[in-house]
Amino acid sequence: MDTYHFLPSRDLEHASSYTPRPDSPETRHEPDPDRSKTNRRPIKIVSSVLLSTLILSFVIFLLVNPNVQQVVRKKVSKNSNGEDRNKASKSPEMLGPPSRGVSQGVSEKSFRQATAEPSYPWTNDMLSWQRTSFHFQPQENWMNDPNGPLFHMGWYHLFYQYNPDSAIWGNITWGHAISRDLINWLHLPFAMQPDQWYDINGVWTGSATVLPDGKIVMLYTGDTDDLVQVQNLAYPANLSDPLLLDWIKYPDNPVMFPPPGIGSTDFRDPTTAWIGRDGKWRITIGSKVNKTGISLMYKTTDFITYELLDNLLHAVPGTGMWECVDFYPVSVTGSNGLDTSVNGPGVKHVLKSSLDDDRHDYYALGTYDPINDKWTPDNPELDVGIGLRLDYGKYYASKTFYDQDKERRLLWGWIGETDSESADLLKGWASVQSIPRTVVFDKKTGTNILQWPVKEVESLRSRSYEIDDVELKPGSLVPLKISSAAQLDIVASFEVDEEAFKGTYEADASYNCTASEGAAGRGILGPFGILVLADDPLSELTPVYFYIAKGVDGNAKTYFCADQSRSSTASDVDKEVYGSDVPVLHGESLSMRLLVDHSIVESFAQGGRTVITSRVYPTRAIYSAARVFLFNNATGVSVTASVKAWQMASATLKPFPFDQL
């Protein structure tokens, strides 16, 4: 068994304003006051401190009372034998444990209802159809953030936030799965459970750091019995085990407490560490001061004792709480990914934050100063939280890691549900992970990254369909003869009639995807694109489309949008229009790629410059009734479209076959 010699048992140096209760168990290791003073560092940006949010005793009661946690669940997904698990209905009950809310550092789920009775009469067939076939998800229950992804001894490892008891948030445990190819997965036993005072209310989000000698360090946030967010250390019990089945929590956890000036519920989600020129490791942790989102900086040599730096890595006023911060380098000249510690000429750094206030992931490109441990955005107008988003749809708490096996940086993201919690309870599961994406610097624009599905997903492609140079006149609709449209990989390009475009002097210069009428709103130069998950009478449809706006100066701006407003006849689902503008360079065709997997549509424009993830819950356009159409709803321009589509096989997701070892 491997031992971690860099993890000696000793007192911790805590820069903390938090002190455990006097009646805490003897197993707790309280900070040494003298040592604590040594590392107390004032944060220069802090002029005033918000008091911690009041934690209601009623919430605590609900969380710990097992009787209350028994919530009606009527599961309709299939078991491993293909049998329907839904045998009988139960009368609606009041929901037990509430969703993780602002008091615990995370916003409520959208469309939360007071009872388990859905407002729409979902059938078993409808709910069963919603389960994806080639996206990662547990066999049942709730999942959220991806955690600590890494590659070890031939296996990709994914850990994730998981509730083993219900399809709603609670009792957060680290699920664990492995894969050879990032597509087909084997479920393993839980990696870590909430069983210590420092994580009894949840083993929250964390990151893995693979050291130069191959050792693995896992830092994660624990929610203590006092509902205080602290950082903890864990490591594999046996590094020679390719499955990494057993994890040891460091005996002297926590290794970091909320520092002075930081609220006890505003300190979470440590990043992967990177090593500086001084030989010390750095990590950053998201937080806030008033309405300013910040990224705290720490140094360590052994991952046990930490020095809080005077300066912040970065801060952006008005962005609120930063969580799930990610920080990594990208090459501006090469096509490979970079290890997190790489810096120097030809390198830019991506800083990404998940904003708790609006539940979106924002990123910016910039320069990292390793001497002063400061990051500066290339364009302050596109700073973190006010500029570019990783994904303009339902996508949150994303996490990258460096795949040393294939020299690429890979991105995971949590795709939550946008139906009601009561519907989630009926189907017995909630949330999936995105298809992993490669991340590279866009050398053509120099202003953004490119995200693209990993090549391994193409192994699921089967029967193909291709159509070239189809003219779409204004107002036209062309069905594509695809027999099964619930699992598709679609690549399409569009050419706008050049003469008509040049003859248009002004067209919807103030267009905005989210404030528009969606694909039904007709303009001179758009919308045009693809309808997926549509039925023949078009009573349900999900358009993904381009829309070109042109100002009086002749400059055009292209938008990429996904319209959910008519995606379902159900009333208790999200029906927003998502999207944003997408850079289109001179000579480029308009291009999109869509991954359709039942209730998920992941859409990529212009090679991944703009990405949108949609959750849709059709009631009619399901199974054999699902169709695909090309459309052009513009009033003043014809479009020529070419499409290639593949039906996608289902990925394998099953328990690891321990009985075959």
Swiss-Prot record:
Substrate binds at residues 142-145, 161, 169, 204-205, 268-269, 323, 356. GO terms for cellular component: membrane; vacuolar lumen. The chain crosses the membrane at residues 45-65. Its EC number is 3.2.1.26. InterPro entries: Beta-fructofuranosidase_N (IPR021792), ConA-like_dom_sf (IPR013320), Fructan_Metab_Enzymes (IPR050551), Glyco_hydro_32 (IPR001362), Glyco_hydro_32_AS (IPR018053), Glyco_hydro_32_C (IPR013189), Glyco_hydro_32_N (IPR013148), Glyco_hydro_beta-prop_sf (IPR023296). It is found in: Membrane; Vacuole; Vacuole lumen. Keywords: Disulfide bond, Glycoprotein, Glycosidase, Hydrolase, Membrane, Signal-anchor, Transmembrane, Transmembrane helix, Vacuole, Zymogen. Residues 1-40, 75-117 are annotated as: Disordered. The active site is at residue 145. One of its GO terms (molecular function) is beta-fructofuranosidase activity. It catalyses: Hydrolysis of terminal non-reducing beta-D-fructofuranoside residues in beta-D-fructofuranosides. Coiled coil: none annotated. It is a single-pass type II membrane protein. The keyword Transferase does not apply. Glycans are attached at residues 171, 238, 290, 512, 633. There are at least three isozymes of beta-fructofuranosidase in carrot: one insoluble and two soluble ones. This is Beta-fructofuranosidase, soluble isoenzyme I. The lineage of its organism: Eukaryota, Viridiplantae, Streptophyta, Embryophyta, Tracheophyta. The gene is INV*DC4.
